[in-house]
Amino acid sequence: GVVVVKGMKPAAQIPQEDVDAIAALLDRANIDAERHLTSDTISENAPVKAWREAYRLFKTKKGARCSIENLLKRVLKGKPVAHITPAVDIYNTVSLTYALPVGGEDIDAMASDIRLGITEGGDAFRPLGEDEDAPTLEGELCYRDDAGAICRCWNWRDGERTALTDASQKAFLIIESVDPARADDLAAATDQLAAMVQQYL
């Protein structure tokens, strides 16, 4: 599911009551996510298992995991997903609620249309929060544009260049599922994401 957002408010212009409401929804989602965790072994939980199987089908950086696994692992360890920015908190809320990976990129920072595909390797990429480049691997599945990679290993690691910031005005938000049986969950998650963005951003 894809949600394209235009005319986003700068974070500083979002009323404090809305910031607090979003934070409360994320807190609730951290609790709700526990229903997706039927095993203390992270890889044995159905949402994680489905993505682990998908990740075996393409070349990945060692240790790369789907973003929803990283979020659910925090919940499993009793370390709730923290508040970051209103926009990121919204998509993390939806991600935790439905146990589906949700990502977001700044459209204005993209060099061209975004595309998902197998790369020949060497695509420029600076991981979010890192000081050194980490180019893509040959045979890796990634999101990219004409300037390089946007998200490594499908939905594992976002890049600095197109990351959403407090000043972002246009956003590309995406929710993904590899389980056909969860089509209704994907549709519901997309609807909730669109509704929250429209209400708060």
Question: What are these model-predicted stretches?
Answer:
Residues G1-L201:
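Charge-biased, low-complexity intrinsically disordered regions
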